[in-house]
């Protein structure tokens, strides 16, 4: 079979035998790819450091029956140094990679939009110009849109009546009007849903001035909505600090 080349975000890796690793890549053209990187754990490996998570690489692979094999790799951008030196940025970036892997779907199913979004999110976290938790929430909202799970924010999830609305219910699909509001719906504080709309649209002007309590409650709703659709909790999200109001809102939205 012919070699192929692609650009990829390194999502994760784990040991294989004494000297090899299996790397999980989110590629631009081929979606999620798992490949063996032979000998990378040896001191003299040609490209071991280039296959660390948070790297953006140009990689050449040889197709295999179950796993491909990395034959060449060049670093395009390395975000790791500017991410791992801060716990908040590190856990946020880990949550982005875990989400990307979960949303990418079947292996080799092209996901160019998710690939580009993931690379952009890591780049933004490494740049340190915006709060990492806001980058994460914007990423999750847009990634869910690509998956077809975007929460309704400025119209009722049930009847499509234009908002603004005051209630949010995860199982209903997001914001709900007074007529469609199911039992157990959360009532976010004023400004929370507007904040989520701005994040989803990438309207960054003024976002950082939003009160911390509003931002944290919005984060809780985003996390609850994502994990309800995934039908399981992401391992990395609990490592990112959430305030009491965010957890309360997420729990209420999940009920019923």
Swiss-Prot record:
Keywords: DNA damage, DNA recombination, DNA repair
Pfam families: RecO_C (PF02565), RecO_N (PF11967)
Tree of life domain: Bacteria
BP term (GO), one: DNA recombination
Record's keyword annotation contains DNA damage: yes
Cellular compartments per GO CC: bacterial nucleoid
Similarity-based family: Belongs to the RecO family.
Purpose: Involved in DNA repair and RecF pathway recombination.
HAMAP family: RecO
Name of the protein in question: DNA repair protein RecO
Species of the source: Nocardia farcinica (strain IFM 10152)
